[in-house]
Amino acid sequence: MDYRELADRVLNRLKQSKGDGRWDDHLSLATWEWPQGVAMYAMLKVYESSHDEKLLAEIKAWYDGHIARGLPGRNINTTAPMLGLTLLYETTKEEKYAPFIADWAEWIMHGLPRTEEGGFQHLTSDCINEQQLWDDTLFMTCLFLYRAGCALKKPAWQEEAKYQFLLHIKYLHCGKTGLWYHGWCFLGRHHFGEAFWARGNSWITAGAIDFAEWLPENDPVRRIVTETWLEQCRALLQCQDPETGLWHTLLDHPDSYLETSASAAIAYGLLKGCRMGLLSCRDQAMAAVRGVVGMIGPDGLVDGVSYGTPMGMDLDFYRRVPIQPTAYGQGLTFLMLTQLMDAFG
């Protein structure tokens, strides 16, 4: 299979999508929000391996256009594109990007609302989410904060990102199952619907291994993050649907629908773990790949993606989330394909 051609098809479908630029425009690249941030991160990772200058020019044009128009209000989700901007800065060394990175990182450090114990409250474009920790936060915000600290030589930012990973592990990782709850609330001290939601888990499967790889090998936080990630991966392999290779949107409830974006992100993490010598599950990882590839239409549109999902107070909430093509569905599938190009293709 030509994974590069497939990746191009998925990416081109995303670039062709037109939207209205609202914060809830989840398919097109017209918006500066978390779905587009996921897609930009994937595109930068492809550039790192391909050195495709046309792709780099498209990424630069996207960021330059949004900066010229003015960046949106700051929250956890609008932070997601900043990770790609930081990688772009590290790649191009264009100093014009540094002030935007520094200003946003300082807002995270000093302006973002905090929960008890100093956690990053999952503030979004439409909800305060008082005293709430979500696993999404680690991918959307903490990856950026750590890389910004690396790029601009700000060790305090790096240490804060490490602390946030440890705090989220403390409250969201289930030691009994190895899986992650979607969220935790200090008001009432509960896990909401106690859902082991697939995409929430997949942010960890994809994001934690990238984060751990960036840390020094002798860093104890790297060891903790890696071991927690390995425990999650072992649990995920037990939940995989044997017929399709995909995962259900509620990981431990086979009556819930199979979900593509989570499966793509999980496959990315498993493939990367195999490449790094941390896992030996290539057959199951490739079964997931085949399942995801089977959801890609002739025009590159990725099907079977659950729409943006806020916190649910019961499991039926997650079962009822509609299926809809999204930028993060395209982006996470594209991210998975980067590992196929690097590791097995």
Name the predicted role of every residue range:
Residues 56-60, 68-185, 192:
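Extended ligand-binding groove/face enriched in aromatic
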Residues 205-251:
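Oxyanion-binding "anion nests"
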Residues 11-13, 20-30, 70, 171, ...:
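His/Met- and acidic-residue-enriched segments that coordinate or traffic transition-metal cofactors
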Residues 50, 148-159, 211-223, 273-280:
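Inter-helical turn/loop segments and adjacent helix faces that build the functional surface
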Residues 31, 133-137, 153, 157-160, ...:
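Short, contiguous, pocket-lining structural segments
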Residues 9, 13, 42-45, 65, ...:
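Alpha-helical scaffold segments in carbohydrate-active enzymes
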Residues 2-37, 49, 54, 65, ...:
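CBM-like carbohydrate-recognition segments
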